[in-house]
Amino acid sequence: MPTINQLIRKERKAVLKRKKTPALQACPQRRGVCTRVYTTTPKKPNSALRKVARVRLTNGIEVTAYIPGEGHNLQEHSVVMIRGGRVKDLPGVRYHIVRGTLDTAGVQDRRQGRSKYGAKRPK
């Protein structure tokens, strides 16, 4: 516990909260170019081949982003939009690619939760 004199000499410093999505720089979404599209395996109790992409953003930062939904059309040099939102079982993946914008197609034959996957209303 500091004395009054110590507090006068040097005031208390507020603890800074760590940002969950630093690469977005307080923007809701950001545009970027895919540098590598690949699959990776999740952490321990789960087993799958999760689709992810390395994305170089317009601000120069390179991040790993998850590609949600079944099937995708992304490849190297695809222009994508990313949003915040981590994938719990993939360490280091803190961003999601927005489906149905720029070069990313929406999910085919999606009937429920369509707005999250950029799918048009079925006829």
UniProtKB/Swiss-Prot annotation:
PTM sites of type 3-methylthioaspartic acid: 89
Any GO CC annotation of this UniProt entry: small ribosomal subunit
Keyword terms, alphabetized: Methylation, Ribonucleoprotein, Ribosomal protein, RNA-binding, rRNA-binding, tRNA-binding
Region (Disordered): 104-123
UniProt-listed Pfam families: Ribosom_S12_S23 (PF00164)
CDD domains: Ribosomal_S12 (cd03368)
Keyword Transcription regulation annotated: no
UniProt record, GO biological process: translation
Molecular function as annotated in GO: rRNA binding; structural constituent of ribosome; tRNA binding
Family matches, as InterPro entries: NA-bd_OB-fold, Ribosomal_uS12, Ribosomal_uS12_bac
Residue stretches of biased makeup (Basic residues): 113-123
Zinc recorded as keyword: no
Similarity-based family: Belongs to the universal ribosomal protein uS12 family.
Function: With S4 and S5 plays an important role in translational accuracy.
Subunit structure and binding partners: Part of the 30S ribosomal subunit. Contacts proteins S8 and S17. May interact with IF1 in the 30S initiation complex.
Name of protein: Small ribosomal subunit protein uS12
Source species: Nitratidesulfovibrio vulgaris (strain DSM 19637 / Miyazaki F) (Desulfovibrio vulgaris)
Lineage: Bacteria, Pseudomonadati, Thermodesulfobacteriota, Desulfovibrionia, Desulfovibrionales
